[in-house]
Amino acid sequence: MQHAPARELLHFIKNSPTCYHVTENIRQKLLANGYTELSERERWEVAPGGKYFVCRNGSSTVAFRVPEMIDGGFAMAAAHSDSPAFRLKEHPDRRSAHYVQLSTEKYGGMLMSTWFDRPLSVAGRVFVRANGEIVEKLVSVDRDLLVIPNVAIHMNRTANDGMKYLANIDTLPLLGGKDSGGILPIVAKAADVAENDILGSDLFLYCRGEGTLLGENEEYILSPKLDDLECACGCLEGFLAAKESGNIAVCCIFDNEEVGSSTKQGAGSTFLRDTLRRIALCLGKDEQELQMMLACSFLVSADNAHAQHPNHGEYADPDNCPYMNEGVVIKFNANQRYATDGRSCAVFRAVCENAGVPTQVMSNRSDLPGGSTLGSISDTLVPVSTVDIGLPQLAMHSSWETAGVQDYEFLIRAMTEYFGSAL
């Protein structure tokens, strides 16, 4: 078992408190690996042998590599950059009872109780005046700043019997005392801008501290945002490491999966379709040739899966549940919440066999509907053969999640094989 890839993942997550930081860190990694950044506002020059990427909204990325000789379609993978969190409202300061709290709302379906009684801070992006223009700046308040305090057991004797949390009351973070100047001066200082120059912002709470490896043999990863930065980073590492094949390799990291993907930068947008069409046009393909390429293309939708829980095995289908450190998970759902079918499963299994990577399967217990993910959503706009996969983890949508060290290495190996193979 190699621990180095997992430690690199933890370092990436620590430096990526929001989807905007995720995208910037991916951008820097692509540039360092010789990829050329394209802009949707400009004409593209794409040539065989070239390596390129394009970002949308500062929170989604599509990277692609064109082989010298194209004799196939697109070999694509998709993961997502966002995670459940609390987003600050436009007027965030709330003053009451000699305290200043921050007014927030939930982003995505989180386990709210896991955000209590731990050091938090604020990160995201601000839009500021600069020389007559509006400029975007990333910001992260790099210190322990906030806490969401629990109510003491002495005041709520039934707390351990189950608690219903109200997002407008129970989960408001504490910033300071009655003389606090509020959050804006702190954000402005962290961004190195004047308060009056901030015209807009997208700010979120995030958990402080770096994740860790634990377990008897350090076989588990404990960290925020494993859903879905574990798959996002694993797909990207495989994409960068793969040898050239006859397919155009495409790695997508979309935003807004946790809220349904129906945004201009989500998997339900035209971002991927637009990018593939522009690639084809730059390579001299017409619409019919593009459709022929799509007909022989493939998409791996990578989003983490629920591992069998050590305390609550009753929530899983006993014959179709995955375990941590036992392989990449292929996900199935009869109602198409996952896009896997017999053919796409077979293709991905063959890829994993060639890479020496074990696979597992997951279907939800038949009376528990479970969630959906990128594959079926993306398929409506880019209809290609698709497999939904993930890595097994515990406590999905908790502020800290647990996954297997070995599985992350398995994913990198599988995606390296996938991007380098002729499907």
Task: Identify what each model region corresponds to.
Residues 1-423:
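N-terminal hydrophobic/helix-forming segments and targeting peptides
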